[in-house]
Amino acid sequence: LGAAAAVGGGLLVLWAAVHYLFGGHFDALFVAMEAAHIVGMAVLIRKLGSERSCEGLSLRTQELTAGYLLLRLLASVFYEGNHHTLLDAASLAATGWVIQLMRHGQISKTYDAARDLSPKDSVKFLVLPCVVLGVLVNPGLTRVRGLLGFVTNSMWACSVYMEAIAVAPQLVMMRNIAEKKGYMERNSTAHYVFALGIARFLGCASWILQPRVLSYVFGQTRSFKLWGAFSLISELVQTLILADFCYYYIKSVVEGSLLVRFHSSV
């Protein structure tokens, strides 16, 4: 109960701070999405601190998360610089701290690298395709022109594509654990991934419900139409990737079970 009160109080403070700084001119669903993400990070940090273990946690997912947050943060300096930037900076700081603990902290010995995606495969199959796609299909905003404009547009697009697949290594790792045991415990790692799922649902709703989405998808120029279509696909892919896990997580809660059983588990 105390932890729930602390989280609730933290979210209230976050909401009040954003409202005060930006005078109420912000996307409520986006703030709720970032709040859910921060709650997930709080659960994760609590796990690392109290359990002194990062067992079942994917370092690749944390690195990809830090990567897309950093790219989006750098690009937003030129294009937004609003509450999005503030909330992304908070998420990046928390993610960076988790990575530091998993790599160099005392809990690094509990990291199961054998079940995680290798750094080489992460770069080859996840990062590079996002970079190439970001260069080829990006918003083409003209606020910043020349080489810097091309780079910032590519960074922004790359962050969108990378965000869509960042959680994939974590889900694969959890599947590997579930296949070995026949189930996965509904523990802190599961709570963290479920919070990401809630954040993703809110983020997708925020994106789709914005009035400018129709102009993205049905823009006047062919390149802008393409960017709008790829952005929408990225949002849907990321939501669908997490939907399967969230379904089985909610099912375990409804059934009163502490175990999450996937459809492929026995």
Predicted regions and their residues:
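Helix-boundary capping/turn motifs
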Residues: 7-10, 34-38, 63-66, 163-164
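Membrane-interface recognition of transmembrane alpha-helix starts
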Residues: 1-12, 22, 29-32, 123
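Juxtamembrane membrane-interface segments at transmembrane-helix boundaries in membrane proteins
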Residues: 1, 15-23, 76-79, 144-152, ...
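C-terminal transmembrane module of eukaryotic multi-pass membrane proteins
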Residues: 165-169, 173-266
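Membrane-embedded alpha-helical segments in integral membrane proteins
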Residues: 9-22, 69-75, 171
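Hydrophobic, ordered structural segments
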Residues: 40-162, 173-179, 230-255
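Coil-to-helix interface segments in alpha-helical RNA-associated scaffolds
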Residues: 37-40, 169
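Short, hydrophobic transmembrane alpha-helix segments
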Residues: 17-27, 49, 53
